[in-house]
A protein has these predicted regions:
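Junction motif at the cytosolic side of a transmembrane helix
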Residues: 8-11, 252-272
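Short hydrophobic, aromatic-rich alpha-helical segments embedded in or entering the lipid bilayer
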Residues: 3, 219-238
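Aromatic- and glycine-rich beta-strand/loop motifs that create alpha-glucan
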Residues: 1-25
Length: 272
């Protein structure tokens, strides 16, 4: 199996154009510029003791009413400074849904082994190889831009030393990266099974938009990537139970997407 994965890695790597990597870097360079020159809050839900959403401005000041709602202005600033560099995670699902098809050379049905008896093992190897390539490129750019933004905030914000907490930043970056990784793998599975047409990509994008708007009015975390990102990037304390829940939900998401795609593919091959 390891040899097959390696073979697929070389095959998919030859398929990916160098312009794709340049495009990813250009997109995230724009993300850095956008975050430094944008609104202080994106898609936020303010509630008692926790503000969900994306907060690109590390110098955001609370109003008197918001201070009473959150409970402690100093705790808010401490959390805000260390999660602000992750705000551009809002766009990650949309970027991934559009870029992942570039890492998929062809759909499973189009492959010469698409309907063979050995398709199961080869499909798993193909998904693993494609997920590795796309995750390395997308997550690498995401993590790099987050670190760059954190360093810029440390240099620009006057009271950065007071709120600097590298452990908190790395912890939130890790959680956010896990959610992004799960979404990338799910996107690879969907595109591998159903292609990169308007239907599959449109469905991926629609789920993200719907999840954000539902989470704005929901009291608890939804087991959807965009919803989980609003928590990991939000100015809200996360307990160990919530972090474990995020990891479990990520695994369930990937497994659910794989199960749905596999079932639909079997039905399609049987009746078509």
């Amino acid at each position: 199996m390891a040899r097959q994965i390696k073979r697929f890695l070389h095959s998919e790597l030859k398929h990916v154009s160098e312009w794709v990597y340049a495009l990813i870097l250009a997109i995230y360079a724009c993300m850095v510029v956008l975050q430094l020159n944008s609104f202080p809050m994106w898609f936020c839900s303010l509630r008692e003791n926790s503000f969900l959403g994306f907060f690109p401005d590390p110098t955001l000041r609370l109003s008197a009413e918001d201070v009473l709602l959150f409970g402690n202005a100093e705790v808010f600033r401490g959390l805000l400074f260390n999660v602000a560099p992750l705000a551009h995670a809002l766009f990650f699902p949309f970027i991934a849904a559009c870029i992942v098809p570039c890492f998929v050379s062809s759909g499973f049905v189009e492959e010469p082994w698409g309907l063979s008896e050995a398709r199961g093992g080869k499909r798993v190897c193909a998904i693993v190889a494609r997920a590795m390539l796309s995750s390395f490129a997308l997550l690498g750019a995401f993590i790099l831009s987050s670190v760059v933004l954190y360093c810029l905030n440390c240099a620009i914000v006057l009271d950065a030393q007071q709120y600097f907490n590298l452990d908190l930043f790395c912890y939130r970056l890790l959680l956010t990266s896990v959610v992004c990784l799960a979404y990338t793998v799910s996107s690879v599975i969907v595109v591998s099974y159903f292609g990169s047409g308007f239907g599959p990509i449109g469905m991926l994008l629609l789920v993200n938009v719907v999840a954000i708007y539902i989470q704005l009015g929901a009291d608890s975390m939804l087991p959807l990537p965009s919803s989980m990102l609003m928590w990991t990037c939000g100015v809200t304390p996360l307990g160990n139970g919530q972090c474990v829940s995020i990891l479990i939900d990520c695994l369930i998401n990937v497994a659910s997407v794989l199960a749905i795609c596999f079932t639909v593919d079997r039905l399609r091959s049987r009746f078509l």
